[in-house]
């Protein structure tokens, strides 16, 4: 069975595209952060997601590795979508969402990046009152998407996976969902 990583920066609509795509396809949708949290809670290391950041880096690496292994094991019986981030923007710079020790355990077959124009993402972010998102310029949004592309290609180089970009433009959700379905079938 396949392991497909789907990622997009906040406001790209990756979750919306994914939810609509999976209504018609037989994939198990797994959020990588949720699996990490489950493992850390089972081990008695944390009680909630916010406490994950406070764990020593080596413990976090062990949890990341265990989460990737757990997801790969699930793929023996199901096609898996891993909903995660290729890169995480931090005050210190961009952090890889899938370090090599995760990729070695996860063994993804494909990376799908959901993107939109910077203007569309900017507008979506400021109009979404349900989320507390950082305000970024159009150039910063473009840079984040470029970093995702670079990271996805680096990940693909390490794993032999392919990289597909699905555009999710305003008022064209059906088109993005159709393209995503054709990639996953």
Curated annotation (Swiss-Prot):
SUPFAM superfamilies: P-loop containing nucleoside triphosphate hydrolases. Gene3D superfamilies: P-loop containing nucleotide triphosphate hydrolases (3.40.50.300). Keywords: ATP-binding, Cytoplasm, Kinase, Nucleotide-binding, Transferase. GO terms for molecular function: adenylate kinase activity; ATP binding. Its EC number is 2.7.4.3. It is found in: Cytoplasm. InterPro entries: Adenylate_kinase_AdkA, P-loop_NTPase. Its main location: cytoplasm. HAMAP family: Adenylate_kinase_AdkA. Belongs to the archaeal adenylate kinase family. This is Adenylate kinase.
